[in-house]
Regions:
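Nuclease-adjacent, charged terminal/linker segments that flank catalytic cores
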Residues: 1-126
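Active-site metal-binding core of divalent-cation-utilizing nuclease and nuclease-like domains
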Residues: 92, 131, 144-189, 198-202
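Amphipathic alpha-helical dimerization/coiled-coil segments
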Residues: 114-156
């Protein structure tokens, strides 16, 4: 009997064949060609910690047909699932299991760094922090509202601020704003979003630090020149208005209802 005959008679266990097929399938799933929109989505999710299909659809996929019907939600959901299947994203259920949130992985960060060498990106969170999830999700909603109103043309998140140098002098990482936003006219504003009432001393200290920072950087055209507080509680609004006092021209303090009400209220 020749060697070919011997080989043809070799039997492979069914379990081994199944395992090979499974690995081949997984390898095939990881083969994905990233588009510019994919990179934008990954960076957006890195910046904001996480996002659901709703937010990704609204920012990147939403289109209106000739009858005025919104389209694109199915494609947004499908693409997020594909990105998760290729290990660029992970997901988890949140808010009583009613919503799936996607967050970026190290593979997403590596892909972004490869396309944009030298650019500082936020680090992957690795998970979703239950202590800040409500604040983070409402901040995500607030960002979309401000962008859709045309009030914001660029958003620099606190997560990105913390990996860049120079912005936190006099403020300190613990007092970093939630974002630095750029307006149509090129001016910049530090954005603070408050969902809970904090100690008066913290508001007083933060106002003091902001005033010092703005004064120190008044000759820097790239620096923010005002601070915009969006708050959930009238009590917080009163405290901030009190401590901003004579510096009120540097601060804009508003209740969140005027913004988040346009995004289906403040519910998650």
């Amino acid at each position: 009997m020749n060697m070919l005959s011997n080989i043809s008679q070799v039997e492979f266990p069914f379990e081994e064949i199944s395992e090979v097929k499974r690995k081949l399938k997984e390898k095939e799933q990881k083969r994905i060609v990233l588009s510019q929109r994919d990179f934008d989505v990954l960076n957006f999710i890195l910046e904001m910690k996480f996002a659901s299909v709703d937010e990704v659809y609204r920012k990147f996929f939403k289109t209106i047909d000739s009858q005025g019907k919104e389209m694109g939600f199915h494609y947004a959901k499908k693409r997020l699932v594909q990105l998760a299947g290729s290990d660029f994203l992970k997901s988890t259920k949140a808010f009583s299991e009613s919503k799936r949130l996607f967050f970026a992985t190290r593979r997403a960060l590596s892909a972004l760094r490869e396309i944009y060498p030298g650019h500082e990106f936020a680090r992957p969170s690795g998970s979703i922090d239950s202590r800040t999830i409500v604040h983070d999700y409402l901040l995500l909603k607030l960002r979309l509202v401000l962008e859709e109103k045309g009030e914001v043309v660029h958003w620099l998140s606190d997560r990105t601020i913390k990996v860049q140098t120079g912005i936190l002098s006099h403020l300190g990482e613990a007092y970093s704003p939630d974002a630095v936003i750029t307006h149509r006219d090129g001016s910049k504003t530090a954005l603070e979003f408050e969902i809970a009432v904090k100690a008066k001393s913290r508001y007083q200290e933060k106002i003091k630090r902001y005033v010092a920072w703005i004064r120190e950087h008044r000759q820097d055209p790239s620096a923010f020149t005002r601070v915009h507080y969006v708050v959930m509680s009238p009590t917080t609004q009163r405290h901030l208005e009190h401590f901003s006092g004579i510096y009120s021209d540097l601060f804009k303090i508003e209740l969140a209802d005027g913004y988040l009400g346009e995004y289906g209220g403040v519910k998650c």
